[in-house]
Structure formats: structure tokens, C-alpha cells
Amino acid sequence: MKKSLLCSTLALAVASAAQAAPKTVDIMVLYTPAATQTANGRDIDARIASYIEFANTAYEKSGVNLRLRLVHKQRLDWADYPTVTGANLDRFMRDPQVQRLREQYGADLVSLVNRSQNSGNGYITCGIGYMGSGDKNSGRFHGNAKDIAYNLTGVDCGLNTFAHEAGHNMGLRHSYEQDLESSYYDPRYAHSGTYEWSRGYGVQGRFATVMAYPHAFGTNKQAPFFANPRLVNAECANQPCGREEHADAVRALNSMATQIADFRPTKVPGTVNPGSGGDTPTPPDLPWCTKAKLGGLLGDGEFASMEGWRAWSGNAQLSLVNVAKGCRDNALLVDVRGFDLLVRPIAPLRAGSGYRLSGKVMLKAANTRETVRMALLSERADGALAYNPAQSVELSVSGNEFSRLEKTFDYRPAADQRNLYVAVWSDSGASLLVDEMNLQEAQAAPPSVPPAPKRIAYDFESGIGGWSGVHASARATRVASAGRLALEAYQRRYAGTGASTSLLGNLEAGRTYAFSADVRVGDGRGSQAMTYAYLYLESQGRPGEYLPLGYKVVENGRWASLRGQVQLPKGPIKRAELMILSGNQQESMFIDNVQLLQK
């Protein structure tokens, strides 16, 4: 099911052509307490992992050049959005704590797992998501598409629901047949989605793809693919899984993948597998990645050092390796020469109390997969290790990405126990990479939502994620005022165009902010240009307004500093778009070192 919002006419940058390497779309998944009380949601971590795996498998087999990456999951217990309804989706999207979490983890898409809604006549509503839209066949999202990339998934429905609702956020509709029944072809209504062909497909009585409703085609068969007329598969009754210029969700997604992956700047570092290419020392000149502190009972579960960790039998060599791209994030490489366990002794726990054990694991050997286990192990008086399945977790793990293992349990000590360990191992004794190990009391307060940052800054050294063109295209450029990179707004169609980014979830209502940015127009051969910045703000109970942040006339080809100050009104913020613009549309505009400081 979809839900459309009226989008502004601000346009995002033209999507680049589909790349061979899939684009990474970061997703945050929250879940309600009630969802965990259902058969499908009792092991909510496994359910979320299955959602991601189903979607990514469908993308891969369909030919879609993007993959979902789970950057955060958390129980939502500060508000009640119990079922899949439009009202709950709207409230969820506008929840300030959800918005802050989205910014903290840089989630391009945000999902809430709750319960389905009885919609009458024997039907239930399994999911609902806002439709990411743009001008028809333009290849550009409207400016607020990134701000409405939220969806709800009923835990009591199938795994395909999650991929379906994320598809709406990415600009996909249901099917041609369902478009005929809705207002899509009614000229009184604006275009919905990205392209006319950005939709699912089905054949009467045979099958429907992920975005199409099977009952609209008189079938129960849902092929686990996105519509692609170039794909012929038995799941599609040995027929094409789409129709050229009619139903081609894969073509639409590949065209928009870069924009979707840039809905928000990346906050959780990407990871690599240095273990597969031999031991790789942590580069000393890289800055540490910015990550939330784990706390808990294991001390340094982020592995700034190896203190306390050892191989139980001495059959493995331990070393620290960097697993991040562009910053420093240690993981522990467990290079096993014979079967062994990675262990760390811990202080005695309270019998009968609840604890949560978690960590991330990847196999050293790329393109391999096997079962990895994480557990509390008790050492008995005779030196033997006792294993309790209730205090352990297992997961099929690959050598291509980190997988998170997590288990909540009530602690029960073994008889004649003399020592207690946290342990990690693979069933075959394969070498592992381990990170973010944590053991904490289950009754501990849930992860806190951080306050709005005092400083918001963009230096574009890691790219222009989260930024887009305003009636222009946007890209990273080496024409920078400082450092290596800046943002270039080019192919500007009008005067008063440039680039923008959403600040929703980063601003605190009622506060004053000082703004500054380095700006430049042209290459030195043109005339002077006016540069200026606005904060477009929509807050509860007030109409949308453009709050000026400053203006300056600049010499062509020269960098100048644009400065100003703004007082935000009180009340919940519904939309906040920072826009930096200029005249002389025939020239590129360059932007660098953007900053807002809370005063």
C-alpha cells in the first residue's frame, strides 16, 4: 500500500547511470513491543535480518543495483503506533525522536515493524509507505522525497511486505492494472512515483511481482522479483517478469539508485574484510570512526586493544585490523590454525537476572558462509566448558559483510561453575573477524536518543551524501576552498538555483543558529553574482516559510564567505531544508565548509 504526499518543486540531482557495484541504501528498523509478542516477532532480530535478506536477494536476482544495509534497529517504546494505518505512519514520520535517530545513523529509509490492520471484507493492511515522487520520467526526485522515506510493515505478514513498502519510498507503484483503478491517469492529480513504468507487473491467473498485488491478477503467486522485462524465470511462469516501457521497476530503481543512497549522509562507516587478503595493520594516520559507545560489562568491546581476549586452546592468533572505509575502526581477527574458541572471562552474573549478549561477526574467507555461535560458557571445577543453548545464539554468517548476533536470556549458572566466559566460534573452526561485542543487563535503560547537535557541518571530504541540486544537478568537485573536495551545482536551469540538504532531525525548535558557508560562482570569466541562503521551515501550526540566512555579491571565480543568523520558531518541526543559491545560472556554483552553530 502506498501513501502520497504533495512534494515541492525542488528537484534532486540527475541520477547517474546504473553502476556495476550496487549502491548501498542504509535503513533503520524500529519495532513495537507488541510486534515482539507475535509468532513472527518473538525473535525480532532474526525477523529483521530475514526482511533485509529477502529484499537484497530480490534485488540481486532481479538485476537491481542497490542493496539494503541495516545501520540500526531498536525497540520503539516512547510512543504507540500499534498498527499499519496512515495516521500511524504520519505520526511515526513526524516523531522527533525517530527523526533524531535517523540522523544519528544516517538512514536513507526508516521502517517500523508493528501489527497489520484489519481493513474489512476479509482483507488486512500489511504495510504502508510514503511514495517517493518526482516529475514524470524526469529521473529526479522532488525535494522532500528524502524526508518522507518512511514505511510501516506488519510483522504478521510475509517477508515481501518489507521490500514492497521500501519500494514505495524508492518511487515504485503497484501495477498498471492498479494504476487504472486509482487516480494515476486522472489529469487532475499530480504524477506519483518516478517514471510511468516504475511499477510492478503481473499476468492474470499466473503471478505478480513484489510491488503488484496478487489478488489484482486472480492469483496467490507472488514472484520474488521486481518487474524486469529482460528477466524470464519459472517464478514468472517462464514469461518475462515485466513489460518494456510499461512495467520495469528494475530500470527505474537503477536510474534512481544514486539518489536513494544519498537521501542521508552516511554515518555508519562501511566495512571491508582485511582478513581475506592477509593480516592488515590498522593505519595509524586515519582518524577514528565516530561511533556510539557500547558500555556494558565487557569493557572494550570495540577493540581499541585486545586486553582480556584469548584463544581458549591456543590454536588461534589474535590481531587487530581496521575494517572501516575512510576511518579507523578496529575489529579482532581470530586466525584459527585448528579448532578454537575466542573467549573473554567476565565477572559473576546475578542468577535469574536478564542479560543481552550481542556482537558482529564476519568470516575471514570472502565468499564463504557457515554457522557462527556466540554464548556464555561456564568453566567447571574439572576445567571442562559447559554450554547452555538458552544462553547462546547462532547465525549463518558470510565472509562478505558483518552480521549481528544478539540474544536476550535469563542467566542460570552451571553446577560447580568456577569461571564464566563470553565466547565466539564457528562450527568448523573457521577464522573470524569480531567487533562490537557487548554484554549488558536486559533491564538497562533502552538506547537513549541523542539531543540535536550543537554543530552541524559539511566539508564534503567524504562526498555530498544528503545534498541535492535545486533545479540543478549536484556532484563532488576538486574545486574546493579548503581540503580536497567541495560541492558543485551545475546544469542550473534558472537564476536562484543551487543545492540543498534536509536538516530535519538536526535542529532544535526555538533555538538560534549561526550560519556560514564558503561559496563561489564560475571560473573567473563571468560577471559578479548574488549568492544567498535560506532555511525553508515548516513547523506545527505555521505555514511554510523561507527564513533568510544571509546574502553576498561575489566576484566570479573567487571564494567568499556567506554568513547569517536565524531564530527558529517554537513548536515541532515538520520540514527543514537548507538551500544555498545564486544567480548567473549559466555558471556552476561551488559550496564548501557549510556550518550551523547552535547559540
Curated annotation (Swiss-Prot):
Give the main location.
secreted
Briefly describe activity regulation: Is inhibited by BamI, the product of its coregulated adjacent gene.
Report the GO molecular function annotations: endopeptidase activity; hydrolase activity, acting on glycosyl bonds; metal ion binding; metallopeptidase activity
Tell me which residues bind Zn(2+).
H164, H168, H174
Subcellular location(s) of the protein: Secreted
Q: What triggers or suppresses the expression of this protein?
A: Its transcription is positively regulated by Vfr, the virulence factor regulator, in a cAMP-dependent manner. Constitutes an operon together with PA2782. Is expressed only during biofilm growth.
**Cofactor requirements of the protein:** Zn(2+)
> Is Signal found in the keyword set?
yes
Q: Which InterPro entries match?
A: CenC_carb-bd (IPR003305), Galactose-bd-like_sf (IPR008979), MetalloPept_cat_dom_sf (IPR024079)
Tell me the Pfam families matching this sequence. CBM_4_9, Reprolysin_3
What's written under domain? Has a tridomain structure comprised of an N-terminal metzincin protease-like domain and two tandem C-terminal carbohydrate-binding domains.
- Fill in the subunit field for this protein: Interacts with BamI, the product of its coregulated adjacent gene, which inhibits its protease activity.
Functional note: Metalloprotease with endopeptidase activity. Specifically cleaves on the N-terminal side of aspartyl, glutamyl and cysteic acid residues. Mep72 appears to be a secreted biofilm-specific regulator that affects the processing of a very specific subset of virulence factors exported by the type III secretion machinery as well as flagellar proteins. Binds directly to ExoS and PcrV and affects the processing of these proteins in the biofilm secretome, but contrary to expectation, Mep72 seems to protect these targets against proteolytic processing/degradation.
Q: Which family does it belong to?
A: Belongs to the peptidase M72 family.
- In its UniProt entry, what is this protein called? Peptidyl-Asp metalloendopeptidase
Native organism: Pseudomonas aeruginosa (strain ATCC 15692 / DSM 22644 / CIP 104116 / JCM 14847 / LMG 12228 / 1C / PRS 101 / PAO1)
Top-level taxonomy: Bacteria, Pseudomonadati, Pseudomonadota, Gammaproteobacteria, Pseudomonadales
What gene name is given for the protein in this entry? mep72
